Curated annotation (Swiss-Prot):
Its EC number is 3.4.24.-. GO terms for biological process: protein catabolic process; proteolysis. It comes from Neorickettsia risticii (strain Illinois). Zn(2+) binds at H419, H423, D497. This is ATP-dependent zinc metalloprotease FtsH. Keywords: ATP-binding, Cell inner membrane, Cell membrane, Hydrolase, Membrane, Metal-binding, Metalloprotease, Nucleotide-binding, Protease, Transmembrane, Transmembrane helix, Zinc. InterPro entries: AAA+_ATPase (IPR003593), AAA_lid_3 (IPR041569), ATPase_AAA_core (IPR003959), ATPase_AAA_CS (IPR003960), FtsH (IPR005936), P-loop_NTPase (IPR027417), Pept_M41_FtsH_extracell (IPR011546), Peptidase_M41 (IPR000642). Binds 1 zinc ion per subunit. The keyword Nucleotide-binding applies. The chain crosses the membrane at residues 13-33, 105-125. In the central section; belongs to the AAA ATPase family. In the C-terminal section; belongs to the peptidase M41 family. HAMAP family: FtsH.
Length: 636
């Protein structure tokens, strides 16, 4: 503040001085007024003619005004008869003193003004260079942002669904509140705590809640903030960060995405002389050099613990590793209750139903779901958020936005309907498959149609039967195309299904030991640089086993569809008519039961006979039209 006042005073003085000088010059020389310069002889002629009204004589300078209003000035010479001439012609004249103090001071300032201006410019540039030098020296300063205990409003009440992690960190909160309680008994609080978990599970929020509960300063920094283009900057920032922590102890330092700086040493293009490794070395030294009474605790977060350096994870640095996983149904319900407090909801909205229908959602996904539901309700001009808004938001997140502007031809709709019906029939006939939530032929995202399945319960592992069922369901679309239209009419719509099936089958063979010929061995990914090189024979064997799994799944899907061909036709016809069907409606169609379908106008009962087919083929007219359109397209 003092420096700011000094700068303001300096510039105000300069502005006032320049203003005074300009005003004095304007006063004496008539700046801004047009003055006409004339010769002294011409001036004498004008006096004799009586055209001069008044003049001012200052030394050898004469300025005045003619009777016509024109201003003039001239330089006088040694002319002793000037005063009598002026009196004779009744010219009003005034003699000014040229050697007064103000005039002398003004002349001095005028003569020194260019030099003073140069000195001022030089001082200005020197200050700018000095400020630039200070900015350059701040490269080594820490970029950690301080969140004081007053501004941090997040507490454990704002964190839900990760009760085990909160229990683990409660000890740290107690230490930050009462460090002497532990030190009296000789106990040492963990110097570092590493939060491990997928993105969106609340690692950063949990760290802020710890600082909010303990009422201590909270420093936040990203792992990428340490490394710059200059050598040694990262290590300097680490030192400065820990110095700030010691000054504000007890405090909490949170390093987000620590894998950016804590990656395993000796791996990468930099080798052992990498700037990142110097930063990591300094971080290791600073963490190991803490004393128990300093009250500075490091909490870091990462979703890639496998790439961290082992020295960073040893006891004495990050003593505790807390895994934060995707919340289960109970955790999702608690998270939704926290977010639903912020929006008005309809009385019939049940949090348990929403939580049951969002398996695999992280805390960030659930927050996004609630926000999307509120936006959808506002777009529909509602006063509260209803179940329909939550369901629409969930479908939008899981399946993508509806592409209503995409116009599909009838033959393309027919192909898509049978493709999705193939997925639906195979899924419904396999007990190990997840229940179907919804099937649609409305284009969503990059898909022309899809069958979305949702598990009834949270899973921590998968059985071989479940994986085989997923392979069969994935190949159900291609199998339906072959059964109904033949091999020549199969489409590229199964590209995503084939990719998904290939990835699953390869994982079964190379990761989970579900191939008798390959055996229970881990081979890893083909593009993994840490993976050992496979022999040609083993690589061919793996490819052969993967192909066999997918081929068997395609054969099994074809068998299921041939045995349930009437159900396949009914479901395809219903998809063409209604475009979207729920899981219960698909089950009713598979069993030939009537079901209620709510349309835009009313509730229409679709009977079994209205969707039945006379034989095991599609309507002849429809097929003939489709084949004609496809043949025309091939010719074009």
């Amino acid at each position: 503040m003092k420096k700011l006042l000094e700068n303001l005073s300096l510039w105000m003085g300069i502005i006032i001085l320049v203003t005074l000088l300009f005003g004095q010059v304007a006063l004496n020389f008539g700046f801004g007024i047009r003055n006409e310069k004339i010769q002294f002889s011409e001036f004498l002629d004008l006096v004799e003619k009586g055209e001069v009204q008044k003049i001012v004589i200052e030394g050898y300078d004469i300025s005045g005004v003619l009777k016509s209003g024109t201003r003039f000035y001239t330089k006088a010479t040694q002319y002793t008869e000037l005063i009598p001439l002026l009196r004779k012609n009744n010219v009003d004249f005034q003699v000014a003193s040229g050697d007064s103090f103000l005039g002398l001071l003004f002349n001095i300032l005028i003569s020194w003004f260019p030099m003073l201006l140069l000195i001022g410019v030089w001082i200005f540039f020197m200050k700018q260079m000095q400020a630039g030098g200070n900015k350059t020296m701040t490269f080594g300063k820490s970029k950690a942002r301080l969140l004081s205990d007053r501004s941090n409003k997040v507490t454990f009440h704002d964190v839900a669904g990760i009760d085990e992690a909160k229990e683990e960190l409660a000890e740290i909160v107690e230490f930050l509140r009462e460090p002497k309680k532990f030190q009296k008994l000789g106990g040492k609080i963990p110097k570092g705590c590493l939060l491990i978990g997928p993105p969106g599970t609340g690692k950063t929020l949990l760290a802020k809640a710890i600082a909010g509960e303990a009422k201590v300063p909270f420093f936040s920094i990203s792992g990428s903030d340490f490394v710059e283009m200059f050598v040694g900057v990262g290590a300097s920032r680490v030192r400065d960060m820990f110095e700030q922590g010691k000054k504000n102890a007890p405090c909490l330092i949170f390093i987000d995405e620590i894998d950016a700086v804590g990656r395993h040493r000796g791996v990468g293009f930099g080798g052992g002389n990498d700037e990142r490794e110097q930063t990591l070395n300094q971080l290791l030294v600073e963490m190991d050099g803490f004393e128990a009474n300093e009250g500075v605790i490091i909490i870091a977060a990462t979703n890639r613990p496998d790439v961290l350096d082992p020295a960073l994870l040893r006891p004495g640095r990050f003593d505790r590793q807390i895994t934060i996983s995707i919340p289960d149904i109970a955790g999702r319900q608690k998270i939704l209750e926290v977010h639903l407090k912020k929006i008005p909801t309809a009385p019939n909205v049940e949090v348990s139903i929403i939580a049951r229908g969002t398996p695999g959602f992280s805390g960030a996904d659930l927050a996004n779901l609630v926000n999307e539901s509120a936006l959808i309700a506002a777009r529909r001009n509602k006063k509260v958020v209803t179940n329909e808004d939550f369901e629409y938001a969930r479908d939008k997140i899981l399946m993508g936005m509806e592409r209503k502007s995409l116009v599909m031809r009838e033959e393309e709709k027919l192909l898509t309907a049978y493709h999705e019906a193939g997925h639906a029939v195979t899924s419904l006939k396999l007990e190990a498959s997840d229940p179907i939530h919804k099937a649609t032929i409305i284009p969503r995202g990059r898909a022309l149609g899809l069958v979305m399945r949702l598990p009834e319960h949270d899973r921590v592992s998968f059985t071989r039967a479940k994986m085989h069922a997923d392979l069969i369901v994935a190949m159900g679309g291609r199998a339906a195309e072959q059964v109904i239209f033949g091999d020549d009419k199969t489409t590229s719509g199964a590209a995503s299904d084939i990719k998904q099936a290939t990835h699953l089958a390869r994982s079964m063979v190379t990761k989970w030991g579900m191939s008798e010929k390959v055996g229970p061995l881990l081979y890893g990914e083909q593009n993994d640089p840490n993976n050992h090189i496979l022999s040609i024979e083993m690589s061919n064997l793996i490819d052969s086993e993967v192909k066999q799994l997918i081929t068997d799944a395609l054969k099994e899907a074809t068998k299921i569809l041939n045995e349930n061909i009437e159900s396949l036709h009914r479901i395809a016809k219903a998809l063409l008519e209604y475009e979207t069907l729920t899981g219960q409606e698909l089950s009713d169609l598979l069993e030939g039961k009537p079901f209620l379908k709510k349309t835009a106008d009313d509730k229409k009962v679709v009977s079994k006979s209205s969707l039945d087919v006379e034989d095991d083929t599609v309507d002849k007219e429809t097929l003939e039209k489709l084949e004609s359109d496809l043949d025309t397209g091939d010719k074009e």
